Regions:
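Alpha/beta-hydrolase fold active-site loops
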Residues: 72
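Conserved short histidine dyad/triad with adjacent acidic residue
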Residues: 32-69, 83, 88-90, 100-104
């Protein structure tokens, strides 16, 4: 068995459009608003995926996403945050979330948000993704 560390210099890695992995449902008027840096993908070895995710809603808009955790999902917010349906902030940089396998969950993002996301296995199944006016 060949075991070795994986090192990524994240500042040197490009942001990849999430639509290239999850499909056109993540496009808004043909433009990407979600980007990824895949830090590791060990699913072939029975592991999971570690990534940095960047949500970039257009000015005056917010992203609303609903998903189901296909494996335990660990989320650590680095920048930005989530809000509730009225625009009140709910999650902040430094917050940690665990979505256990099978848990339906959602997020509303009206500002650029970057998170470290670690899946124990498969990534989330996205049930709904839309961009809407940020009017409260």
């Amino acid at each position: 068995m060949n075991v070795r560390a994986i090192l990524q210099k994240t500042d040197e890695m490009p942001w990849v459009p999430a639509s290239s992995l999850f499909g056109e449902k993540l496009l808004v008027d043909g433009k990407d608003v979600v980007f990824l840096k895949i830090l590791s993908d060990r699913r072939q070895e029975g592991g999971g995926v570690a990534e940095m995710t960047r949500f970039s809603p257009p000015p005056g808009k917010r992203i609303r996403i609903k998903a189901v955790a296909e494996s335990d999902e660990h989320v650590y917010l680095l920048k930005g945050g989530h809000e509730d349906g009225t625009g009140e902030p709910l999650r902040f940089p430094g917050d940690y979330l665990l979505h256990p396998k099978g848990l339906p969950h959602s997020a509303i993002l009206s500002q650029e948000t970057i998170a470290l996301v670690i899946y124990a296995g498969e990534p989330d199944r996205i049930m709904e993704f839309r961009v809407e006016n940020a009017d409260r």
